[in-house]
């Protein structure tokens, strides 16, 4: 009885899990750069466009919070910036 309930909870958590991280350009592993003097101005709208809650400039790159699992973030495909153009 408890096993099916535990399995259902695990599946629901996995489906609705959100993540934080540096968003990257499509078909690359390159972060969006930003101006740290304008902490929210560029990054927050960018992160919201990618269905995150908000974002801010951190170490000269856009850090987003509460991103869906299907949005790629820096580090998932390596630690170097590259392009498939």
From Swiss-Prot:
Main location: secreted
Residue span, LCN-type CS-alpha/beta domain: 19-82
Annotated signal sequence range: 1-17
Known tissue expression: Expressed by the venom gland.
InterPro entries: LCN-type_CS_alpha_beta_dom (IPR044062), Scorpion_toxin-like (IPR003614), Scorpion_toxin-like_sf (IPR036574), Scorpion_toxinL (IPR018218), Scorpion_toxinL/defensin (IPR002061)
SUPFAM superfamilies given in the database record: Scorpion toxin-like
Annotated Gene Ontology cellular component terms: extracellular region
Molecular functions per Gene Ontology: sodium channel inhibitor activity; toxin activity
SS bond list: 30-81, 34-57, 43-62, 47-64
Pfam families with a match to the protein in the record: Toxin_3 (PF00537)
Keyword annotations from UniProtKB, A to Z: Disulfide bond, Ion channel impairing toxin, Neurotoxin, Secreted, Signal, Toxin, Voltage-gated sodium channel impairing toxin
Biological process according to GO: defense response
Classification via Gene3D superfamilies: Knottin, scorpion toxin-like
Protein localization: Secreted
Function according to Swiss-Prot or TrEMBL: Putative sodium channel toxin.
This protein's domain notes: Has the structural arrangement of an alpha-helix connected to antiparallel beta-sheets by disulfide bonds (CS-alpha/beta).
Family stated for the protein in its record: Belongs to the long (4 C-C) scorpion toxin superfamily. Sodium channel inhibitor family.
Record-given protein name: Putative sodium channel toxin Ts34
């Amino acid at each position: 009885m408890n096993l099916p309930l535990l399995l259902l909870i695990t599946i629901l958590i996995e489906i609705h899990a959100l993540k934080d991280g540096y968003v990257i350009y499509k078909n690359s592993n390159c972060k969006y750069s930003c101006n740290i003097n304008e902490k929210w101005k560029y990054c927050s709208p960018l992160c919201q466009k990618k269905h995150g809650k908000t974002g801010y400039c951190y170490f000269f790159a856009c850090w987003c919070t509460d991103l869906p699992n299907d949005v790629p973030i820096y580090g998932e495909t390596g630690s170097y910036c590259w392009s498939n153009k």
